[in-house]
Amino acid sequence: MPAVLLAAGLALYWLPVPGLDEAALDAMGGLGLVGVLPWPVLAGAALLVVAFAVLLWPSRPQRLLLGLVLVATVVSLHALPAVVEEQPRFATAWQHLGFLEYLDRTGGSAPALDARWSWPGFFAAAAFVLRACGVTDPAELAEVVRWWPLAVNLLALVPLALLARSVRAGWRARWCGVWFFALSSWVGQDYFSPQSFTYLLYLAFAALLLRWFLAPSAPSGGMLPGAEAPPDATPGRRAVLLGVALALFAAAVPAHQLTPFVMLGVVTVLVVLGRCALRGLPLLLGVVAVGWVCFLAEPYWSGHFDELFGGIGGLGANVTSSVSGRIEGGSATHQLVLYSRVALAGLVMALACWGWWRRREAGYRERALPVLAFVPAAGFALQAYGGEMALRVFLFALPGAALLAALAFFPRAGTSERERAWDRVSLAPLAALLAGLVLVGGFLVARWGNEAFERVRPGEVAAMEWVYAHADPTVRLLWLSEDPEESVTPALPWGSRAMERVRYVPTQAPRDPVLAGPLAEALREAGPVSYLIVGRGQSAYLELDAGYSTSWERRLLATLDARDDLVPVVRNADAAVYALREAPPGTPEAATPGPPGPTVTWTPWSVLGALSAGLLVLLLGAREFLRLRAAPDAPPSPAVRALFWFAVPLLLVTVSALVHRFWTLA
């Protein structure tokens, strides 16, 4: 029966997909891709949910079928745009190709061009691996971008499965937790980016901690530990696993500005609660993470301290800008997509809280999973993260929240005959089915509801290629924004080449498309070799997310075409590029990428701090490896105590140097 449901679900889901051509995609409105999907596709997605839920009924797991349905669900949910859209989706993924192109062309980074160059680890690793594999052609790189989200979501299942094995629960709860994770991965941070790469590192790091480095916990007050005891391992094997955990963190630090601090927060709270055996790990990881920010990410914060860290403590303002601030304005239909995201995140977190309570009632004490689920919320007190902090918080909270949500339906471990008898008559699989149907329906709306402007159209790519070809020595490209001060990321396949030679200038989009005079004036002020681009993706964004009229793009293009001082230099079905008929006087300025990174201001205090930090990392790392050789409850050895006292003065010097750098350079 489950195999038949799986086959029927896949057939219903994929057979109508070839009928989704470019004309059908052009009809997308406020609901995005789900608004143009044939009903059999939706029925197929529901059948995949039913197939998995049916497999939760038997007394023994059918692992092969469970795995097949899970993988088929992930592929179906995440591969759809890659199959139906002519170009790889999402504008920022194209921009990240520009980082690879710049690295390949110049051999270095350019911190003055973009703050992300202060964390170049992902771009350097991707450029190295792709070149080693012979992937250098732009068409081949585009295919990497196309299939990257699917690969990330499939790879995420591996650490999730390991994380699920750390929970003292029955097989239904473990499989259901991984399933809920897959159905709730609609956040959209899986595109070709440092965030998606470091998210995989975060999942693997958390799985290692909870599987092999949980501190021993004995039953107390009639409550059993909610986590399985770590497997027996020799000191040598534990040392190797610790080395892997440190390598994962070390790979995340130079690749992303947020992920290492989430990893640090999780391990710190686990240590404070007595649930992590690596008691010295927070200090070691903290020195590494803060040291990178203070020294190698100096261009990111130097001179912008208040702008970057002024949001610390502003919990209410950060939550508002991340949640309600992203829903204001826009079309009523598209607001359903934004409200569905809030509702789905709230549903998963509510199920997680219910799961914690049901585990408590069943006699299990959960500590580790709530840490994974709720520690990321501390990000709200740090920064608004460009209005995206709510999405990032849910992204990092999802592994723990999904497993806790599964425990709401299957709270017992099934280790006693009484628990097994209860599971045989429980209607929990039916309840999980209903939850799965809600989650998969919500996924299709929340994940693909922005596709009208997150989709990349062929004509937009052609227009950008024309711009790159004419960026000699530089070019200013004006694009239309509803708020040039706050909305600074265009819905265009921008930045994939010539990073230092194209300056993107957000320009106020007139609410009344007839009033296009300020656009021509902005072109004059931009100077020679300046162009104005009007793309369908950005126009769709303005209509759906900023409340511009549905006829706005058509009327604006007619107005621009009618002006005597403007001439279209590119015109196709998806984009138009305009230039002044009489170019402004002057000579285009030369490209100024700035000095190659890393850019560090060295003072005597900085040199002393860097040397102290390096020695401190070595001492703390050696101390942690030595502690692994002792029994869990054994007192510290003389060598461990000696390393601690040697580390104290180095820590004081390092902290003093870091404070001095922030104070003098901020």
Where are the regions that the model predicts?
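Alpha-helical transmembrane segments at the extracellular/periplasmic loop-to-helix junctions
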Residues: P38-L48, W148-L150, Q257-L258, G314-R358, ...
